[in-house]
Swiss-Prot record:
Residues 9-86, 95-167, 182-260, 275-350, 365-442 form the BAG domain. It comes from the Eukaryota. SUPFAM superfamilies: BAG domain. Binds to the ATPase domain of HSP/HSP70 chaperones. Binds PRKN. Interacts with HSPA8 and JPH2. This is BAG family molecular chaperone regulator 5. One of its GO terms (biological process) is regulation of inclusion body assembly. PROSITE patterns: BAG (PS51035).
Length: 447
């Protein structure tokens, strides 16, 4: 159709659709909640467009009616997606976990920086547990959920780093102000930096509405300028003291960029992350080797070569950069367990083959332990091949088989024989590790 002859109502509908299209990515990637300002802004824009669409006169013409219907459906679809993003059960789960972290920080951390409390090991364990729970929140590959999870993780992990750095660091004692007049100023700045830590933590966790990131950045930059202007008269000890305080300020300043970092696509879309890609490449090769070993007619011939390569894969995983990202850390941890489990499987197979080739006299209890190890080897092969979840009948069957082997080992009386005791202990540990591995494989974790 000639654009110059296009009906004004069609032109208006196309204009509205372009306006709606321009905010589509903002809606798809919206990671907040329904009480956020940005939610209300997007909702207001889309609702306004719906009214605009409804006001277009179709003049009873079928083509205009169809165009208006399509425009309304597109806009309503985005409104629905916006609402679903903000109210998704896993988004609410992220919110609830974050609120737990807020309560913990408000109670334990902020008072620490005012000198009325201290950071305990219980707090550190609690914050680590919160981080682990966040990494296990399912996103289903949904951009808004990945973004919300990563956004929340960056804040809580930043608090964890600030606390750990402060607790771990053994700072130099403030120099005596008698040493040089500039020392008094450095001591004063150091006190302000300590206060700024508490303010920063409160800001990151949203437990202090009286401060802003911009103002705190100005305060820290001002303290930095004050230190730069000091004349230390070439005194090495004063220069080193000043440098320590400057480094502390720089560490705090980097956390003020977290909002921007959390909006970076490559930060939350871990499928594109180079560390995750490395981990996936290792896992791909490990799975190829696993399939080859489980299907091999003469596996003993593959043992040495396979174990050497698997150890090399462990080395590759050790070199993966964690980027201070708990999701990457968890992905690497699980990959290491995957590879180590296959190595353990090969070690047990080798031991069982060696026992067949070089039989020796064994006591009945020791022989009973070896029988269990033989059973565990067969079960472990099945567990390595397992790819379901915890509701699968096969999962329940494997879990029952492993529990049965543990009960059998519990019934073995080593009769005081140390060698048998050690073998039974090792077999129990192996059975428990296989159970843990089965649980890990079936928990449907994703990054």
């Amino acid at each position: 159709m000639d654009m110059g002859n296009q009906h004004p109502s069609i032109s208006r509908l196309q204009e509205i659709q372009r306006e709606v299209k321009s905010i589509e990515q903002q809606v798809v990637g919206f990671s907040g909640l329904s009480d956020d300002k940005n939610y209300k802004r997007l909702e207001r824009i889309l609702t306004k467009q719906l009214f605009e669409i409804d006001s277009v006169d179709t003049e009873g013409k079928g083509d205009i009616q169809q165009a208006r219907k399509r425009a309304a459906q597109d806009t309503e679809r985005l409104l629905k997606e916006l609402e679903q993003n903000a109210n998704h059960p896993h988004r609410i789960e992220i919110k609830n976990i974050f609120q737990e972290a807020q309560a913990l920080v408000k109670e334990k951390t902020v008072p620490f920086y005012s000198g009325s409390n201290c950071v305990t090991s219980e707090f550190e364990e609690a914050i680590q547990d919160i981080i682990l729970r966040l990494t296990h929140v399912k996103t289903g590959g949904k951009i808004s959920l990945r973004k919300a999870r990563y956004h929340t993780l960056t804040k809580i992990c930043a608090v964890q780093e600030i606390i750990e750095d402060c607790v771990r660091k053994q700072p130099s004692l403030p120099l005596s102000e008698d040493v040089h007049p500039s020392v008094a100023k450095i001591n004063s700045v150091m006190c302000e930096v300590n206060k700024a830590r508490g303010t920063l933590i409160a800001l990151l966790m949203g437990v202090d509405s009286s401060e802003t990131c911009r103002h705190l950045s100005c305060v820290l930059s001002g303290l930095m300028a004050d230190l730069d202007a000091l004349d230390v008269c070439g005194r090495t000890e004063i220069r080193n003291y000043r440098r320590e305080v400057v480094e502390d300020i720089n560490k705090l300043l980097k956390y003020l960029d977290l909002e921007e970092e959390a909006d970076n696509t490559h930060a939350f879309d871990l499928g594109q992350n180079h560390s995750i890609i490395k981990i996936e490449n290792v896992l791909k090769r490990m799975r190829e080797m696993k399939n080859e070993l489980l299907q091999a007619q003469s596996p003993p011939e593959l043992y040495l070569r396979s174990k050497t390569e698997l150890q090399g894969l462990i080395g590759q995983l050790d070199e993966v950069s964690l980027e201070k990202n708990p999701c990457i850390r968890e992905a690497r941890r699980r990959a290491v367990i995957e590879v180590q489990t296959l190595i353990t499987y090969l070690d047990l197979k080798e031991a069982l083959e060696k026992r067949k080739l070089f039989p020796c006299e064994e006591t009945p209890p020791h022989k009973a332990v070896w029988n269990v190890l033989g059973n565990l080897s067969e079960i472990q092969g099945e567990v390595l091949s397992f790819g379901g979840n915890r509701t699968d009948k096969n999962y329940i069957r494997l879990e029952e088989l492993l529990t049965k082997q543990l009960l059998t080992l519990d019934a073995v009386d080593p009769l005081g024989e140390e060698k048998c005791k050690a073998a039974r202990k090792q077999a129990v540990k192996l059975a428990q590790n296989i159970l843990s591995y089965l649980d890990m494989k079936s928990d449907e974790w994703e990054y």
